[in-house]
Amino acid sequence: MNNSKESPEIRFAVLIDGDNAQPSLVADVLKEVAKYGKITIRRVYGDWTSRQMETWKKHLPQNAVQPIQQFRNTVGKNATDSAMIIDAMDLLYGGNVEGFAIVSSDSDYTRLAIRLREDGKFVIGIGKMQTPEPFVRACDLFVYTENLVKP
């Protein structure tokens, strides 16, 4: 009988802003998050009817990432951000994950990261070096995508 008191592995939801992340780095992003726990949810949000999302399509099946459709109903509004935030809150209250990885360089996720941390969740942010400082600081850990790219 094993009496070791190892802490349980953190279950992560990886939520990717498809309008604001690089498809070619999906495998590297998932590998990075897996260092901190088990990834149980992998989603990328965007308007899959737009040409902008075409480059994502080959990376989805290779990395077992679920595409989440969000139509752009109004020009100038980012419906993707709203959909991702709503799903994150649903996951928070569902209680099936202890950690979140928010993949975006968008400061609109700052309040979400703060709220998730207030509830005791571990938050990893992943984005470009140009990511606004408030979002970076709102996360427990922030990984710059430039550091994921192999030379």
Question: Where are the regions a protein language model picked out?
Answer:
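VWA/integrin I-like adhesion module and closely mimicked acidic/polar interface patches used
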Residues: 113-144
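Acidic beta-strand-to-loop metal/phosphate-binding motif
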Residues: 45, 98-105, 112, 116, ...
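Conserved alpha/beta core segments of nucleic-acid transaction machinery
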Residues: 146-151
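Conserved acidic residues
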Residues: 12, 98, 140
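Short acidic loop-to-helix transition motifs that present clustered carboxylates
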Residues: 84, 107-109
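General alpha-helical segment detector with a strong preference for membrane-spanning helices
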Residues: 21-23, 110, 144
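Short beta->alpha linker loops
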Residues: 20, 48, 79, 104-107, ...
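Domain-level signal for Mg2+-assisted phosphodiester chemistry and nucleotide/NA-binding surfaces
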Residues: 1-93, 114-115, 122
